[in-house]
Amino acid sequence: MPTEIPDPRLTEVADNVFAYIQPDGTWFLNNTGFLRGERGVTVIDQCGTEARARRFQETVARTCEPPVQTLINTHHHADHTFGNFVAPPHATIVAHRKARDEVIATGTSIAAAFEGPDWGDIEIVPPFLCFEDRLTLFVDDLECQLIHFGTPAHTTND
C-alpha cells in the first residue's frame, strides 16, 4: 500500500457547493464536501486519518473565509468520522443518533484490523447534535434535509 497521501481534487459542483475527491491509493479514502455560506461553512463528513483530515481542513480554510460552523457525519464509519477531532472546537457535529452510538461503541478498534493507513493520533469525537428521523439545516438560503429512512443501507445509520 502506498504511504503517501494522494493529491485530492477540489471541484465547485454548484455555487458555493464543493466536492473534495480523494483518488484511490490506500484504505480509508472517502470523498467529502462542504457548503460555503456568508456566515459559516457546513462540512459533509471528515477524512479517515489525521493527515488527511488536517489536509481537508486546510483546503476548507483556504477556500472559505467564514469558519466551519457545522460538520455532518453521514454515518459512523471511520473514513467519515475519525477526523472529527480536527474540526474547530466551536463546530457543531451532527449525525443520526445511531451514528453517534456506533462511533462511541467502535472507537478506534477498526484501525487494528487494517494495515497501511498511517492513522496519526486519532481522538474519537462523536456527533453531539443528533436526530432520529430528519433534520433541516440552512446554509444561507440553501435548505439541506438530513433524512434517515429507517431501513439499513450501507449502515444502520446513514
Region roles according to the model:
Residues 8-9, 31-33, 129, 133-135, ...:
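Residue-level detector of beta-strand structural context in well-folded domains
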Residues 44, 74, 157:
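Active-site flanking residues adjacent to catalytic metal/cofactor-binding acidic residues
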Residues 23-24, 119-122, 126-128, 148-152:
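Short Gly/Pro-enriched turn/cap motifs at secondary-structure boundaries
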Residues 51-54, 58-130, 134-136:
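Active-site HxH/HxHxD metal-binding segment of metal-dependent hydrolases
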Residues 134-158:
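Core dinuclear metal-dependent hydrolase active-site scaffold
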Residues 13-19, 115-119, 140-146:
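Short Pro/Gly-enriched beta-strand edge/turn motifs at strand-loop
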Residues 2-10:
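Short acidic, Pro/Gly- and aromatic-enriched capping/linker segments at domain boundaries
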Residues 10-59:
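Conserved beta-strand hairpin/beta-sheet module of binuclear metal-dependent hydrolase folds
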